[in-house]
From Swiss-Prot:
The lineage of its organism: Eukaryota, Viridiplantae, Streptophyta, Embryophyta, Bryophyta. During the catalytic reaction, a sulfide is transferred from Cys-224 to a reaction intermediate, generating a dehydroalanine residue. Homooctamer. It comes from Physcomitrium patens. This is Thiamine thiazole synthase 2, chloroplastic. The gene is THI1-2. HAMAP family: THI4.
Length: 356
């Protein structure tokens, strides 16, 4: 089997381990993509420019003409679909706040159940958080084993080393998981939308207060600009750490007295940090689950720096906590049986794993 794509002159070929033979998940699940040093760069034979890869109709690039359209049609199509999404998710099952690596992994895992409506709120125009690059603006992404099994599932190629794998560019992970996630009909990503506050009923989080991110950033320069709301059975807070938008979910819980403190993350310790983040991903108050680096903020555990496996697995664990809260089958209760049952690894400090 030939892996799709070539990396900087190095062909990537699948390496199949005996432990993964017979996997029933997606076509490349259980296949490790490793660099083959003897491989030669091969240029695919591309057809002449045509109207479609599946059509013999040729382009005339000197006289290319698009079909005519009214400008109002473009406006109407965008507006109608967005408003329909807002109406659909005004009362939704799960709201994921923050579309970084943990939030995207959580939403991806949730989206496997087509009956669960998932809304993702991201204050930036560009989702992905810090997962577009590795550390110090370098390109490569390091993922410690056994979290590489999640990469196998979503078919991200990597170079396999002894205790970890390396993705040649972090954007391969982020773009791949987004393309798979957003193609699913039960998921909507709301870019450039900020979660300004929480909806609280009694002692339970029941949704989020939303606004356009540019409005949220300019309340001090304009007159009153009231928000919107999104009710949800479960809110997953994956707001990361540091900065004005970091850990906003747990900081708000502290300000209203629902939790005692948010001590902030400790100094870097990769080995302690990743295990702790996955282990302590949890429902901190009824209706609100915390995942990713926001866990380190609320627990005062170490930061982990530029290694990303805990973000992926913490996101998966948060998804199964949300399914549990919804009363649905989940991996934590051992009754998870989706149509496609990928291998799931829940890392912990004592190296316990749950396999599919």
């Amino acid at each position: 089997m030939q892996a799709a794509g070539l990396a900087a002159g190095v062909a990537f070929a699948p390496k199949i381990s005996s432990s993964n033979v017979g996997s029933s998940s997606s076509s490349l699940a259980g296949v490790r993509m490793v660099a083959s040093p003897k491989a030669q760069l091969r240029h695919a034979r591309l057809p002449a420019a045509s109207a479609s890869m599946y059509s013999d109709a040729k382009y005339d690039l000197n006289n290319y003409k698009f079909e005519p359209i009214k400008e109002s049609i473009v406006a109407r199509e965008m507006t109608r679909r967005y408003m329909t999404d807002m109406i659909t998710h005004a009362d939704t099952d799960v709201v994921v706040v923050g579309a970084g690596s943990a939030g995207l992994s959580c939403a991806y895992e949730l989206s496997k159940n087509p009956n669960v409506k998932v809304a993702i709120i991201e204050q930036s125009v560009s989702p992905g958080g810090g997962a577009w690059l590795g550390g110090q603006l370098f390109s490569a992404m390091v993922v410690r084993k056994p979290a590489h099994r999640f990469l196998d599932e979503i078919e991200v190629p990597y170079e396999e080393l002894e205790n970890y794998v390396v993705i040649k560019h972090a954007a391969l992970f982020t773009s791949t998981i987004m393309s798979k996630l957003l193609a699913r009909p039960n998921v909507k990503l709301f870019n450039a939308v900020a979660a300004e506050d929480l909806i609280i009923r009694g002692d339970r989080v029941s949704g989020v207060v939303t606004n356009w991110a540019l409005v949220a950033q300019n309340h001090n320069t304009q007159s009153c600009m009231d928000p919107n709301v999104m009710e949800a059975k479960v809110v997953v807070s994956s707001c990361g750490h540091d900065g004005p938008f970091g850990a906003t979910g747990v900081k708000r819980l502290r300000s209203i007295g629902m939790i005692e403190s948010v001590p902030g993350m400790k100094c870097l310790d990769m080995n302690a940090a990743e295990d702790a983040i996955v282990k302590h991903t949890r429902e901190v108050v009824p209706g609100m689950i915390v995942t990713g680096m926001e866990v380190a903020e609320i627990d005062g555990s170490p930061r982990m720096g530029p290694t990303f496996g805990a973000m992926m697995i913490s996101g998966q664990k948060a998804a199964h906590l949300a399914l549990k809260a919804l009363g649905l089958p989940n991996e934590l209760d051992g009754n998870y049986k989706p149509n496609v049952h990928p291998e799931l690894v829940l890392a912990s400090t004592d190296d316990e794993t749950a396999s599919a």
